[in-house]
Amino acid sequence: MGQKVHPTGIRLGIVKDWNSKWYADSGQFSELLNNDLAVRSYLAKKLSHALVSNIQIDRPARNARITIHTARPGIVIGKKGEDINNLRQEVSRMMGIPVHINIQEIRKPELDATLVAANVAQQLERRIMFRRAMKRAVTNAMRVGAQGIRIKVSGRLNGAEIARNEWYREGRVPLHTLRADIDYGFAEAKTTYGILGVKVWIFKGEVFEQPEPQVAAGSSAIS
């Protein structure tokens, strides 16, 4: 089962969290969902050069909070914050509510599966040998602290007539262990022979349940 199902979907509520957090009645659900997809598509195109890994959307009462995880926060913010202000205004216009944008820096992009997959895809588009690209990504991830990594490339590799897939793994990648913190990423490389798919699994360790912090008598917890 762990080999076939999406590594993030099966771990939601265990060691992974949702990328969109909001509540809506049945009549508004589809509208808000399509709005989220439109915002994500716009941000992905607008920030395609900023190495964006993930976009989280929260909708508190009558406003929205968007967290952008990027390896290049300076490109997103822009000179004196001009770019992020323009971005906030455009997203607010799309969503129809006030929007607050947070920038979360990714300090180790070698451990982010989405960025690793995008990097391998870019190398394939530059006609670098796929085995060399996979080996380099695996070596960099293990060097900065990954406990295991697996990379799979599918398509017409090296322009072959018959499509196939090749994969490379180092360390442990326990897909069946639900408490395993496994980051999954996917990217596409557009080559002259067609599209190549790149999948990356990175195992960062096991997450054990932590006790909830106790609230002192007479005080309240604020989330």
Swiss-Prot record:
Keyword DNA-binding: no
Residues that span the membrane, as ranges: none
Domain KH type-2, residue spans: 39-107
GO biological process: translation
GO MF, one annotated term: mRNA binding
Family designation: Belongs to the universal ribosomal protein uS3 family.
Name used for this protein in its record: Small ribosomal subunit protein uS3
